[in-house]
Amino acid sequence: MGHVTDIRSNSQGFNLTDSVYERLLSERIIFLGSEVNDNIANRLCAQILLLAAEDAFKDISLYINSPGGSISAGMAIYDTMVLAPCDIATYAMGMAASMGEFLLAAGTRGKRYALPHARILMHQPLGGVTGSAADIAIQAEQFAVIKKEMFRLNAEFTGQPIERIEADSDRDRWFTASEALEYGFVDHIITRAHVNGEVQ
């Protein structure tokens, strides 16, 4: 029969049976490590609101390794980030694609980071339409509105002209960390984090 090893730290009181994500949350670190869907959005929104209520002035760190996902779910996360009174630092690790890119760039200006080998993908919002001809027309109209708004916000986040955002989003556009820095998705490339929370 196997057994669980319980290793405790005298300074932190941390043991291997603790939930990693709960431990990170206690340090004001939240993690988007999957496709963006309603369940993930509800969890992240709740975590942001909780941390903002606990301390309205201390930063929240959002780490992103995501292929993207639902536009409505992603916009719920974005609106909650804007609602929070504290700064939200964003970190790209692995892949920040589509809605992952959007949330990365939506972080507090000056506090958006990429790890050296992170990859960032920008493209047009994707959305399928079904139903009757009238329903399809309504959905297509709404999708056009959302697409225009996301182009506008990405232009605001990056400082790029909206015309360039539209042109570069026409097809999948991948960025290295250095290219993402130059484009304006992030403000820093980091290689090391210190115990006190500072980054290099």
Curated annotation (Swiss-Prot):
Known EC number: 3.4.21.92
Coiled-coil stretches noted in the UniProt entry, renumbered to this chain: none
Database matches in InterPro entries: ClpP (IPR001907), ClpP/crotonase-like_dom_sf (IPR029045), ClpP/TepA (IPR023562), ClpP_His_AS (IPR033135)
Annotated localization: Cytoplasm
Active site: 98, 123
Keyword hit for Protease: yes
GO MF, one example: ATP-dependent peptidase activity
SUPFAM superfamilies in the record: ClpP/crotonase
Catalytic activity: Hydrolysis of proteins to small peptides in the presence of ATP and magnesium. alpha-casein is the usual test substrate. In the absence of ATP, only oligopeptides shorter than five residues are hydrolyzed (such as succinyl-Leu-Tyr-|-NHMec, and Leu-Tyr-Leu-|-Tyr-Trp, in which cleavage of the -Tyr-|-Leu- and -Tyr-|-Trp bonds also occurs)
Gene3D superfamilies: 2-enoyl-CoA Hydratase, Chain A, domain 1
Subunit structure as annotated in this protein's UniProt entry: Fourteen ClpP subunits assemble into 2 heptameric rings which stack back to back to give a disk-like structure with a central cavity, resembling the structure of eukaryotic proteasomes.
Name of the protein in question: ATP-dependent Clp protease proteolytic subunit 1
Organism of origin: Mycobacterium leprae (strain TN)
Source taxonomy: Bacteria, Bacillati, Actinomycetota, Actinomycetes, Mycobacteriales
